[in-house]
Amino acid sequence: MVYWIIIMSTFVLDQLTKARAEKFFVDSPVNLLGGILSLTYVQNRGGAFSILEGKRRFFIIVSIILILFLCYMIFKSTSNLYKFSFSLIVGGAIGNLFDRIVKGYVVDFIDIKVIPVFNLADFFITGGVLLLTFLILKEGGEELFLKKKP
């Protein structure tokens, strides 16, 4: 149950921040931290780093498959940390999928200058992938499906 709350919370937070970006940053970006960080509005019609721009249908199909697979992994995994990492990825993926279906593009707005502009969904996906990678490297993936001891 808690993992579905994490998924919904990340989705809602992502959508709320994107709505604010659309309202306030379209014509007037905000520079913060001496210009190191900017809040600006960007329509991303590709994937991460704007790769495969214009391949909307591809990203929708891949996102749906990934979301379904990771929801299955949440259900099957016995490790709370794995479930948490999957939940972050799913919540972020749903946020970007929603944008692609409803708007035809993903709203990005966080600009740190040294990396491409991104959004909170991307942040959650990246955090979930980093945690998952760390867990697999640390544990070898054994914790994914081990049965809990009675």
From Swiss-Prot:
Residues of the signal peptide: none
Pathway entry: Protein modification; lipoprotein biosynthesis (signal peptide cleavage)
InterPro entries in alphabetical order: Peptidase_A8
Recorded GO MF terms: aspartic-type endopeptidase activity
Domain of life: Bacteria
Any GO BP: proteolysis
GO cellular component, one term: plasma membrane
Enzyme Commission identifier(s): 3.4.23.36
Keyword GTP-binding found: no
Class of the enzyme per the UniProt entry, highest EC level: hydrolase
Keywords assigned: Aspartyl protease, Cell membrane, Hydrolase, Membrane, Protease, Transmembrane, Transmembrane helix
Catalytic reaction(s) noted: Release of signal peptides from bacterial membrane prolipoproteins. Hydrolyzes -Xaa-Yaa-Zaa-|-(S,diacylglyceryl)Cys-, in which Xaa is hydrophobic (preferably Leu), and Yaa (Ala or Ser) and Zaa (Gly or Ala) have small, neutral side chains
Positions of the catalytic residues: D108, D122
Transmembrane segments: 58-78, 85-107, 117-137
Membrane topology note: Multi-pass membrane protein
Function: This protein specifically catalyzes the removal of signal peptides from prolipoproteins.
Family recorded in the similarity comment: Belongs to the peptidase A8 family.
HAMAP family on file: LspA
Protein name: Lipoprotein signal peptidase
Organism expressing this protein natively: Caldicellulosiruptor bescii (strain ATCC BAA-1888 / DSM 6725 / KCTC 15123 / Z-1320) (Anaerocellum thermophilum)
Lineage: Bacteria, Bacillati, Bacillota, Bacillota incertae sedis, Caldicellulosiruptorales
